[in-house]
């Protein structure tokens, strides 16, 4: 009886020690995204002099509009991958008294799209095409007079160029 009790206690103690050495499997954590997703393509579309409506159309509603600085909109985006470190991006858009875009600042690189930033400009893959002889340009043969090709060429030569109209600026005054 005494030996059985001692044996049972020792097996329990050894079992608990073995379990203490094992780690518990991690719990799955989802990615947490918050705020406005602002892509580099959106930033590239912004131009000085744009109205608030045009900026809102491109960027969406601002996450923060400062009550003390009504001419400033802040776009925040944060991503925390499950179990990873939180990453945050910020873009501030500033307007003048005429509600026109004056400047922007924040976490972006002009001219580099998000895809290029993630993938890199050079993927490291080199592809060489087989060498081919350069084609010699064919000499242009004039169309036969009265043929369909001659008629089309005459129509193209007689086309009048028309200047492209510039759009009127949007009226931003209250009605």
From Swiss-Prot:
Record-linked Pfam families: BamE
One biological process term in Gene Ontology: protein insertion into membrane
Region forming the signal peptide: 1-21
Subcellular locations according to the entry: Cell outer membrane
Gene Ontology CC annotations of this record: Bam protein complex
Subunit relationships: Part of the Bam complex.
Protein name as catalogued: Outer membrane protein assembly factor BamE
Organism: Pseudomonas fluorescens
Gene name per UniProt: bamE
């Amino acid at each position: 009886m005494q030996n059985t009790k001692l044996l049972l206690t020792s097996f329990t103690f050894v079992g608990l020690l073995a379990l203490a050495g094992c780690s518990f499997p991690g719990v799955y954590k989802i990615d947490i995204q918050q705020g406005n997703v602002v892509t580099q393509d959106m930033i590239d579309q912004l131009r000085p002099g744009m109205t608030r409506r045009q900026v809102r159309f491109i960027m969406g509603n601002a996450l923060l509009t400062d009550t003390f600085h009504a001419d400033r909109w802040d776009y925040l985006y944060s991503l925390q991958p499950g179990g990873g470190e939180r990453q945050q991006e910020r873009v501030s858009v500033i307007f003048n008294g005429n509600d026109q875009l004056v400047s922007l600042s924040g976490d972006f690189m002009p001219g580099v799209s998000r895809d290029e930033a993630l993938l890199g400009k050079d993927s490291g893959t080199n592809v060489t095409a087989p060498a081919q002889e350069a084609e010699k340009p064919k000499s242009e043969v004039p169309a036969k007079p009265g043929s369909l090709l001659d008629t089309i060429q005459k129509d193209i030569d007689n086309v009048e160029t028309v200047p492209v109209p510039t759009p009127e600026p949007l009226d931003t005054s209250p009605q």
